C-alpha cells in the first residue's frame, strides 16, 4: 500500500503513471494493482511543481492532486 499524493482526473477514474522513458500513461482506478504503478509522492508541494511542469509540456490536462488513501477507500 502506498502513501502520499497522486494525480487523478477530476472524476477520480484514472491515475497518472510516469514511465521510465518519461512518458505519461493513464490507468484506471478500478483495480488496486494500478495504484502500485501510480506516480506517488509524499510532499504535496513537489506534486504541485511537477503538475505545472507536466502541464507546460502538454503531457497532462487538468488533473487533481489527491491522497492515494482516498482512492484505496473507493475500491
Name these PLM-found stretches.
Residues 24-36:
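A short, surface-exposed interaction/processing loop segment used at functional sites
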Residues 1-2, 36:
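Sequence-level motif detector for i,i+2 pairs with an aromatic at +2
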Residues 3-27:
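N-terminal acidic leader/helix
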Residues 16-20, 27-29, 41, 52-55:
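Short amphipathic beta-strand/extended segments with alternating polar/hydrophobic composition
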Residues 34-75:
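Short, mixed-charge low-complexity intrinsically disordered segments
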Residues 10, 29-31, 48:
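Intrinsically disordered, low-complexity serine/threonine-rich segments
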Amino acid at each position: 500500500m502506498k502513501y502520499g499524493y497522486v494525480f487523478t482526473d477530476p472524476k477520480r477514474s484514472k491515475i497518472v503513471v510516469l514511465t521510465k522513458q518519461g512518458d505519461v500513461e493513464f490507468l484506471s482506478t478500478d483495480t488496486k494493482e494500478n495504484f502500485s504503478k501510480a506516480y506517488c509522492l509524499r510532499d504535496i508541494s513537489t506534486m504541485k511543481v511537477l503538475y505545472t511542469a507536466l502541464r507546460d509540456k502538454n503531457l497532462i490536462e487538468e488533473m487533481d492532486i489527491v491522497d492515494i488513501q482516498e482512492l484505496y477507500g473507493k475500491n
